[in-house]
Swiss-Prot record:
Role description: Antenna complexes are light-harvesting systems, which transfer the excitation energy to the reaction centers.
Domain of life of the source: Bacteria
Molecular functions per Gene Ontology: bacteriochlorophyll binding; electron transporter, transferring electrons within the cyclic electron transport pathway of photosynthesis activity; metal ion binding
Source organism of this protein record: Rhodovulum sulfidophilum (Rhodobacter sulfidophilus)
Ranges per topology, Cytoplasmic: 2-23
Lineage: Bacteria, Pseudomonadati, Pseudomonadota, Alphaproteobacteria, Rhodobacterales
Protein name per Swiss-Prot or TrEMBL: Light-harvesting protein B-800/850 beta chain
Periplasmic topological domain residue ranges: 47-51
């Protein structure tokens, strides 16, 4: 088996592919965080004992 120097260990992705996956993961995390923040804000408003 020959080693491909363009691949990133241990995934086997190229550096460009790994960066693309990372960007999508970060974008998804930001969307999830924004939705969670909004949901917590609504829950705090709707909960009578929190004011």
């Amino acid at each position: 088996m020959t080693d491909d120097m363009d691949k990133v260990w241990p995934t086997g992705l190229t550096l460009a592919e790994a960066e693309e996956v990372h960007k999508q993961l970060i974008d998804g995390t930001r969307v999830f965080g924004a939705i969670a923040l909004f949901a917590h804000f609504l829950a705090a408003i709707a909960t009578p004992w929190l004011g």
